[in-house]
Regions:
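Small/polar beta-strand repeat architecture
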Residues: 188-240, 367-369, 374-407, 415, ...
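Short "repeat-start/strand-capping" segments in structured domains, especially the N-termini
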Residues: 97, 121-124, 248-252, 270-276, ...
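Ser/Thr/Gly-rich low-complexity blocks that favor extended beta-strand/coil architectures
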Residues: 133-136, 142-144, 158-209, 347-379
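Short, T/G/N/S-enriched strand-turn elements that build extracellular solenoid repeat scaffolds
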Residues: 65-69, 85-95, 246, 264-270, ...
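Short glycine/acidic-rich loop motifs that flank beta-strands on beta-rich extracellular proteins
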Residues: 73-74, 87-90, 110-115, 135-140, ...
Length: 583
């Protein structure tokens, strides 16, 4: 059975709070506290100078927040309308307790990638707030068409098809090939994508050759771009995030609308717990039909928390990266400095004194050894006991004192975004009654992943139920299967079992390419009662198949229904590859 299931008792009723009950997998339950609006005093943000006519509402709104900090059990009301924020500083919510921010549909318009930083708060709710970007000042992304491409001169022209004028100094950060008719991320054939900002010097020169045309000369890495192709060119990728949430408990975001954000929608980390997104929207700004991106990176990124969260009734689309990514980070040992100290490499150091470090081999095998962290100094971790001889370079270290598991993702609509739908990399998850449509890559991915230089994330999964969801035309570019479960260690798979108790049941899958499920490193996997209809599209031999790979055991595949299709004649086949343990 899964471990660390939430089993919270119903909190004692009190005047200042209400409690939302969340029922998860295997009869788990947890509660999220919210301010009781009926018992809260009320103050209007206009008292502090927040005004739709103001050039910059930053200082006035910060004053309102400070008042709420000094006076808990309060509702801060923001009247409907548009409010500009031009100061290049974050709005800090630090130490607030029992505060409701009721925005009544107000929209905050930013022009710098500094938004909300929510730190050390407890029991707060932000309701009805819209956030967008001041597109009159700069753009987050643009549709471009390739013309006059030349391999000989390593150049092409970019026609900004929705703009009348473009500046030669507009940032060129990342290209993603788009469907030229639907204007959605990804193409079935000849998909291309380049994160040019990761390779300084790949763009040699940019010159303006027309009102809305730029000529790009490159180092040859973009020679496969051809005339007529349509791309989304991002001018911004990371660095920002509408809501940064750190070490905060019992926080609710309800009815939030993110229409154009530089960075992620939500970055929730640093041991936050008991949080929820209810009825929130990430999508294209309906007032700007030439804006083709919602958030330039992930919709929701949850890492190194204490979990117990819910995402329900939301609508996420057109992000520059995954809909939702749930995980905890890991680290690798780069050097053993003495009997009790190691140096580590990680993209997100999540350790603190008092934590328990758990060690695995470089192949993810559990070593049966853990130690308490006594100090963290940069990349150095010191422990409360001597390290055995087998703790060596390239061993993996995870933090046993954090767990982003115990979550429910239900009743949402995930669609037409770049990259994946859900990355589910933590324990005890329930993913049910969601709709997935035309995600560029696979709609659900379960992984433990070391990609050195980029990220190190995922501690394995014990307990995940994926049920009663619908998947339509997902995985446009066919990155693996609809449901993908695997490990990656810089391009290689682990040889051990790292995923346990995963169920995929009663889902419907329509008109997709590639396999239905691709699984490795999992024990007790159930794929039952799903419905597959691949009558549309074109012929492909792998469409709808299930493949079971190495380090799998106790796999049950039963009662799945397939509509006959000449486009997917082998969809009932189950493939086995590199199986080393009994099925």
């Amino acid at each position: 059975m899964p471990e660390n299931l939430a089993a919270e008792s119903e909190p004692t009723t009190d005047e200042m709070h209400t409690y939302d009950r969340v029922d998860g997998v295997n009869d788990s339950v947890f509660y999220i506290a919210r301010p009781n609006e009926k018992s809260c005093r009320s103050v209007n943000a206009s008292v502090f100078g927040v005004n739709t006519e103001a050039n910059d509402n930053y200082t006035a709104f910060c004053k309102a927040i400070e008042y709420c900090k000094a006076n808990p059990n309060i509702t801060l009301k923001v009247d409907g309308g548009k409010y500009y924020f031009r100061t290049d500083k974050a709005i800090m919510l630090d130490g607030l307790k029992n505060v409701l921010i009721d925005a009544d549909g107000a929209q905050f318009i930013f022009e710098n990638p500094n938004y909300f930083h929510i730190v050390n708060c407890n029991c707060i709710e932000i309701r009805g707030l819209g956030i967008t970007w001041n597109l009159d000042v700069s753009r987050l992304a643009s549709l471009v068409k390739i013309r006059n491409a030349s391999k000989e001169s390593h150049s092409f022209e970019l026609e900004f098809t929705e703009l009348n004028e473009v500046s030669a100094d507009i940032p060129i950060m990342a290209f993603t090939k788009y469907d030229p008719e639907a204007l959605t991320p990804g193409t079935r054939q000849d998909f291309k994508e380049n994160y040019v900002y990761q390779f300084p010097g790949s763009i040699k020169t940019v010159e303006k050759t027309g009102h809305n045309v730029l000529k790009v000369t490159h180092d040859g890495s973009l020679d496969n771009y051809t005339d007529g192709e349509v791309y989304l060119l991002r001018h911004h990728v990371y660095g920002g995030n509408a809501f940064n949430v750190y070490n905060t408990s019992n926080i609710t975001f309800s009815g939030i609308k993110l229409y154009a954000v530089a960075g992620m929608g939500w970055l929730i980390e640093n041991r936050s717990e008991h949080f929820q997104l209810l009825g929130c929207v990430i999508g294209l700004d309906p007032e700007h039909d030439d804006n083709r991106i919602s958030t330039t990176a992930d919709g929701v990124h949850i890492a190194n928390t204490n979990g117990k969260f819910r995402i329900s009734g939301c609508d996420f689309s057109f992000m520059g990266d995954d809909d939702v990514n749930v995980h905890d980070n890991i680290a690798t040992v780069t050097d053993k400095l003495d009997e009790k100290t190691v140096e580590i490499y990680t993209n997100a150091n999540n350790f603190a004194a008092g934590d328990t470090a758990i060690f695995s081999s470089k192949g993810f095998d559990r070593l049966g050894f853990s130690a308490g962290v006594t100090s963290v100094e940069g990349k150095k971790l010191t422990f409360d006991k001597d390290l055995p001889d087998y703790i060596v370079k390239d061993c993996i270290v995870s933090n046993g004192s954090i767990d982003s598991g115990n979550y429910v993702i239900s009743g949402n609509y995930f669609h037409e975004n770049r990259a994946r739908g859900l990355l589910l990399q933590s324990n005890n998850g329930l993913c049910e009654s969601n709709r997935f449509y035309k995600t560029m890559a696979n709609p659900i991915k379960v992984i433990m992943d070391i990609s050195s230089g980029l990220w190190l994330e995922g501690t394995g999964v014990n307990g995940l139920v994926i049920r009663n969801n619908s998947f339509v035309e997902c995985n446009v570019v066919e990155w693996s299967a609809q449901i993908s479960i695997f490990t990656n260690i810089d391009g290689k798979s682990a040889d051990s079992t790292l995923f346990y108790n995963i169920t995929v049941e009663n889902n419907s899958f329509d008109n997709f390419y590639g396999r239905l499920v691709d699984a490795s490193n999992v024990s007790n996997l159930n794929i039952c009662g799903n419905r597959v209809n691949n009558k549309g599209g074109s012929y492909e031999a792998r469409r709808g198949r299930i493949i079971i790979r190495q380090s799998c055991s106790r796999v049950t595949i039963s009662n799945n229904e397939y509509k006959a299709s000449v486009k997917a004649p082998f969809q009932r086949l189950i493939e086995f590859k590199n199986i080393k343990s009994a099925i």
